[in-house]
């Protein structure tokens, strides 16, 4: 989140706006990658999921994860809670790493989050919690919030608190390719 001093400065600047300009133009097809000219402005439509996948492949050992999914030593259940992380999880976990299609649930982003609340906790992600309590539960369960900056991590019938998950991740990041040189620092918010 932006510091309050920054957001206050932006708000103060909005008070000085005395005009704005409009341009009548056809709608831009955001599903077609490439550039579009809109007046004097060039708009570039990118695939953020593809870019994110490339970054994650640099940070994590995709070969090891893929091998674990293939040989059964790793199984995953991810609940996107009908938020923005769904397409990212489908692309990376299912399409790239080979997890079963049903390993990622509630993956289609919906304006109303499917009638639920995209808060990754035992109350709002109760479907995942119930799934992870089954006798043949996956080895790893996870859910994320509406914009993907908070998560819930679970093992088979085991809940990892947000503060513990941050500590576990920080303590073991050196094992990941993208963090072999160490971690510069971590930050936590009030909930963690």
Residue ranges and their predicted role:
Residues 81-87, 148-149, 191-192:
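Gly/Ser/Thr-rich loops at beta-strand to alpha-helix junctions
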Residues 1-136:
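Gly/Ser/Thr-enriched, mixed-charge loops and adjacent short helices
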